Amino acid sequence: MGVTCVSQMPVAEGKSLQQTVELLTKKLEMLGAEKQGTFCVDCETYHTAASTLGSQGQAGKLMYVMHNSEYPLSCFALFENGPCLIADTNFDVLMVKLKGFFQSAKASKIETRGTRYQYCDFLVKVGTVTMGPSARGISVEVEYGPCVVASDCWSLLLEFLQSFLGSHAPGAPTVFGNRHDAVYGPADTMIQYMELFNKIRKQQQVPVAGIR
């Protein structure tokens, strides 16, 4: 894999969420991007079980268990303000056995699904973020395949993002700053998705139609 940037695209003025997704994919196709299947990234939140907190008024910690269709044999466990553990798919079974320590947060599952596009050395994924039956936002992931160090290709990634996102192109992801000259890996992408999902959860105190 290369270096990846994950961002949110706001719903276009006067358009529905689905219409905005269609506008984005049409722009990509006009650039010459070709469809290459579909993708899915999902996330379920777990919180520290009350029985493990003691009586000192300690705050519970969160853990995010995530899957990415690009890595079908892996499961990612991201701890709040902590490390990212990469395990095999049986980790979900282990979480059931750890219910005395971590409990699934009610109605916490969030996911994004959509279409993959290949454009030269760029892999682009435009997805609809959903919580339960409701569409909550739009995710855009762009990967530049030939490079594995973020600082070496961010300007190129940004230029490509601006070509179809315009003024909505994002700033550099926080994981880039933390790993300026380090080799980029799958965990860095999952951290970006975790941040995106948490941002969308906080935004969705109002109906998605109200976003402009």
From Swiss-Prot:
The keyword Lipid biosynthesis does not apply. It is found in: Nucleus. It holds the Pfam family Med20. InterPro entries: Mediator_Med20 (IPR013921). GO terms for molecular function: transcription coregulator activity. Component of the Mediator complex, a coactivator involved in the regulated transcription of nearly all RNA polymerase II-dependent genes. Mediator functions as a bridge to convey information from gene-specific regulatory proteins to the basal RNA polymerase II transcription machinery. Mediator is recruited to promoters by direct interactions with regulatory proteins and serves as a scaffold for the assembly of a functional preinitiation complex with RNA polymerase II and the general transcription factors. Component of the Mediator complex, which is composed of MED1, MED4, MED6, MED7, MED8, MED9, MED10, MED11, MED12, MED13, MED13L, MED14, MED15, MED16, MED17, MED18, MED19, MED20, MED21, MED22, MED23, MED24, MED25, MED26, MED27, MED29, MED30, MED31, CCNC, CDK8 and CDC2L6/CDK11. The MED12, MED13, CCNC and CDK8 subunits form a distinct module termed the CDK8 module. Mediator containing the CDK8 module is less active than Mediator lacking this module in supporting transcriptional activation. Keywords: Activator, Nucleus, Transcription, Transcription regulation. One of its GO terms (biological process) is skeletal muscle cell differentiation. Belongs to the Mediator complex subunit 20 family. This is Mediator of RNA polymerase II transcription subunit 20. PANTHER family: MEDIATOR OF RNA POLYMERASE II TRANSCRIPTION SUBUNIT 20, UBIQUITIN SPECIFIC PROTEASE HOMOLOG 49. GO terms for cellular component: core mediator complex; mediator complex; nucleoplasm; nucleus. Transmembrane segments: none annotated.
